[in-house]
């Protein structure tokens, strides 16, 4: 039987941990079990409970102090250490067979765009631990206010899709922050990115030298036709969480990974007709 895992990716501050917790909470409310695996050795203490935590193996702060490295160098060292000790991860995952594991990943995208750290871990999960994996890439909705920044984020999402070679779901998080600034009709244009959005952008006037570059990036995203977003509002719209989970279930074939359950025998109650 295959395990099911979800990777939460995206820049720092987009709400990955909040997303992970929202998915966990929703799954618990419908009677399903799931756990968060923290893969960020620099994670700050939070209200969210991690079932498996890379900081039990190695932490960024310890590496910075002992190896005299900066934050980025220490982060790479932590992941290289993890790759050399994947048996620790195997042991921690252990008997989690019929439960979701949600991997909360660091926000530094160079871990999969510049060095093959995350792709290596992904392949290990697939081949050695028999995981059906799905990647989710979060981009915060306020990016749509700065359209060139939005298309830059969409390009990063596409890069992750290509390099990780996983079923991929892109998510526009923190939708509640732009509800008073962007209409539903306009938002739909960002959920399925349209390069024509740049034509109405003030960026072309304030930064004319970047207009050509921004247009090239937008057209590249459009040419591949790979990037679409689902809206997410963890604070006020539980339906958006349920919708995203249904997409994850579909691409990971969750229902097919479940063992058939024995039918519950009906118990006939004795009735006294007298």
From Swiss-Prot:
One of its Pfam families is ATP_bind_1
Q: Where is this region: Disordered?
A: 255-274
Residue ranges of the motif Gly-Pro-Asn (GPN)-loop? 70-72
Q: Where are stretches of biased composition, namely Acidic residues? A: 265-274
Q: Where exactly is the site Stabilizes the phosphate intermediate?
A: 72
Superkingdom as given in the UniProt entry: Eukaryota
Q: Print the keywords alphabetically.
A: GTP-binding, Hydrolase, Nucleotide-binding
Q: Which GO terms describe its molecular function?
A: GTP binding; GTPase activity
Fetch the Gene3D superfamilies from UniProt.
P-loop containing nucleotide triphosphate hydrolases (3.40.50.300)
Establish whether keyword Glycosyltransferase is in the entry.
no
Could you list the residue ranges that cross the membrane? Answer: none
Per the record, the GO terms for biological process are: mitotic sister chromatid cohesion; protein import into nucleus
Positions with a binding annotation for GTP: 13-18, 173-176
Which CDD domains does the record match to this protein? GPN3 (cd17872)
- Recorded family membership: Belongs to the GPN-loop GTPase family.
Check the record and name the PANTHER family matching this protein: GPN-LOOP GTPASE 3 (PTHR21231:SF7), XPA-BINDING PROTEIN 1-RELATED (PTHR21231)
Summary of the function given for this chain in its UniProt record: Small GTPase required for proper nuclear import of RNA polymerase II and III (RNAPII and RNAPIII). May act at an RNAP assembly step prior to nuclear import.
Its quaternary organisation is: Heterodimers with GPN1 or GPN2. Binds to RNA polymerase II (RNAPII).
Q: What is this protein called?
A: GPN-loop GTPase 3
